[in-house]
């Protein structure tokens, strides 16, 4: 049985660059429990609909697979179905749809297309030192209840902040990457609790050779720092809106 640990938590009131970069230097994930953003109060469903409306978006089924995983629909349709939990539970053959195949709005450039929304989360971007991370990219994510990503890693230091909802996140250090049985991690779902499908992470056969796994639950008003190269899995326990900010060191 693999050892499972909780991600460290820090309740600092005002996150500053010095503290943030100390975690980057140590290559260590951490939850900052007191994330402040205007978006937490402002981004109600009605507000987002008033800004974005019927704009066509491409909704992903997060297998990170082929283009057939992408379904076009109106933003208003996606958000309303998500809030009402109206997406199908079973496929056309009556089989239960896996979490990684449930709708997840993750490639919509909401913050770039609607600067008024980006203004609400600008403090995420400002935590990065542009002399070190000379490219900072921001993205927004809206996931329906029980949607999930597959296990993957990012190419930049990632600060993910929850605006609404709740996420269950699993993290694995780069030193354990070769110990992951990738096919099993895709074929057998990770179980969040006894009401969920799949295998509990500590008993999951895909990770039996890993030395340690970290988990956390990230809720509204909290941010998680995911160091570059760390493998992670994200399960939206509820309908969830979040923002990620990646700091990258690019050769100029």
Swiss-Prot record:
Superkingdom of this entry's organism? Eukaryota
Q: Which Pfam families match?
A: Cupin_8
One MF term in the entry's GO annotations:
2-oxoglutarate-dependent dioxygenase activity
JmjC domain spans which residues? 103-252
- From the Swiss-Prot or TrEMBL record, give the protein name: JmjC domain-containing protein A
Q: What species was this sequence derived from?
A: Dictyostelium discoideum (Social amoeba)
């Amino acid at each position: 049985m693999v050892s499972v640990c909780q991600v460290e938590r820090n309740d600092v009131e005002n996150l500053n660059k010095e503290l943030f970069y100390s975690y980057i230097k140590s290559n260590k994930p951490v939850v900052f429990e007191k994330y402040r953003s205007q978006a937490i109060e402002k981004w109600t469903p009605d507000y987002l609909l008033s800004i974005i409306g019927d704009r066509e978006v491409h909704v992903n089924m997060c297998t990170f697979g082929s283009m057939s995983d992408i379904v076009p629909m109106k933003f208003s349709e996606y958000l309303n179905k998500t809030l009402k939990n109206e997406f199908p539970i079973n496929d056309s053959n009556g089989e239960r749809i896996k979490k990684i195949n449930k709708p997840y709005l993750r490639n919509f450039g909401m913050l770039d297309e609607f600067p008024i929304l980006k203004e609400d989360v600008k403090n995420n971007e400002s935590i990065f030192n542009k002399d070190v991370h000379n490219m900072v990219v921001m993205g927004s994510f809206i996931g329906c209840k029980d949607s999930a990503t597959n296990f993957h890693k990012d190419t930049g230091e990632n600060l993910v902040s929850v605006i609404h909802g709740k996420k269950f996140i699993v993290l694995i250090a780069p030193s354990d990457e070769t110990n992951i049985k990738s096919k099993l991690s895709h074929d057998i779902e990770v179980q969040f609790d006894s009401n969920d499908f799949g295998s509990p992470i500590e008993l999951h056969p895909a990770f039996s050779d890993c030395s340690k796994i970290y988990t956390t639950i990230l809720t509204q008003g909290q941010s998680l720092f995911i160091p570059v190269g760390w493998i992670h899995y994200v399960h939206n326990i509820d309908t969830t809106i979040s923002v990620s900010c990646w700091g990258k060191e690019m050769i100029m």
